[in-house]
Amino acid sequence: MTKQFLLTGGSGMIGSEIMRHLSLRGYKVNNLSTKPSSNPQTFLWNPKKNELDMNALKDVDTIIHLAGATIAKRWTKRYKKEILESRIQSTRVLREAISSLPVDQRPKSLICASAVGLYPNDQNKVYSEDDPGGDGFLATVINQWEQEIFKSENLGMRVCCLRIGIVLGKGGGVLDTLLPFF
């Protein structure tokens, strides 16, 4: 049987590439989206309202969770709250949906985006996942988000956080923001 993935954040730069690569390799990829789609493999969810179409989880082996408000916007007090809540709440909605499934029907793995913004800005040190995080807004967001993510281990899932750095690429990421300055 072909492995099946569920992706959140599939409309973003990283998510769309992951979806494309998995599909090219013959994997079935379901996508959770907050916007309706005619694609039969796209399912609706609304983390703010604790809503998730449970059909999205049917026969899923691995969830790749990339959803969250972009950090590439002005950080007003209100938007900082959205950055944090979008990550915590979407992760919580996923975990609660998974926990409602019979144990033998739960995904085996949860891969979540995280960020290197956890670590202090020190050009003379190489950090590992064993190093403590820094201070500041991003470090706080990442600490709270990863705490929420790792609660899914209690569901018998393998959990992995990918601490991603700055992403450069055509058609997205920070490169589009920086190019006008050059």
Residue ranges of predicted features:
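N-terminal Rossmann NAD(P)H-binding glycine-rich loop of SDR-like oxidoreductase domains
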Residues: 4-25
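Active-site Tyr-X1-5-Lys
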Residues: 135-159
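Conserved glycine-rich Rossmann-like NAD(P)H-binding loop of the short-chain dehydrogenase/reductase
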Residues: 27-34
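NAD(P)-dependent short-chain dehydrogenase/reductase
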Residues: 153-160, 165-182
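Glycine-rich NAD(P)-binding loop of the Rossmann-fold in SDR/ketoreductase-type enzymes
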Residues: 82-90, 133-136, 140, 144
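Conserved Rossmann-fold NAD(P)-dependent oxidoreductase catalytic core, especially the SDR/UDP-sugar
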Residues: 92-136
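NAD(P)H-binding glycine-rich loop region in Rossmannoid oxidoreductase-like domains
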Residues: 37, 44-91
